Amino acid sequence: MDKGVKGFRFDVINVIGKDEDLKDSTNNVGKEMYTDKPIVHEFIKEMNKETFGKLESITTVGEMSSTTIKNCILYSNPKEKELSMTFNFHHLKVDYENGEKWSNRPFDFILLKKILNEWQEQIEKGGGWSALFWNNHDQPRAISRFCKEEYRVEASKMLAATIHLLRGTPYISR
C-alpha cells in the first residue's frame, strides 16, 4: 500500500479456514467442511483491521467458491468490515452439464434471469456489493457460451450492457 497499490483481489478467499474437528462429510463433495466457515469471516475482519481497512481508498474483491447470497452479503456489507465486494459464479453455471463448465451445452436463459435477479435483489437488501462479470480465467468465454456466432457483435453489446446496468462494480476481461 505504501507503494501505491489501491486494490486487492483475493482468490477463493472463502475457503481459507475449516473446522478443526475434522468430521466426515455427509456427501461426496464435502464443500460444507471448508467453505464459508465462521473462522473465514474472523480472518478477513482481522486482515481488514490490520492492513487494507486502514485506508478508505483501498478496494478489495473476494472470489467466492460455492458460496451463498447470505455469505456474500456478510463479506461485502461495509458494516461487517471485511471486503468491498465479492465475485460469485452462480450466474455462470446456467450452461453446465452435470456440474461441468466446459460441456458447451445451450444455456438456460430463464434460469440466468432468475439468478441475476435474485442476487441483485438480495445483495441490495442486505447492504452488500457485487463484482459483476461474464469472463475470467476459470471460465469459457461468455461470447462463446451465450451468443450465436451470427449475432456476435450485437450479443457482445448486450452482454456489456447487462453488467453495466446491474447494481455492482463491472469487471471487464478479454
What are these regions (language model features)?
Residues 1-174:
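Active-site and adjacent substrate-binding regions of carbohydrate-active enzymes
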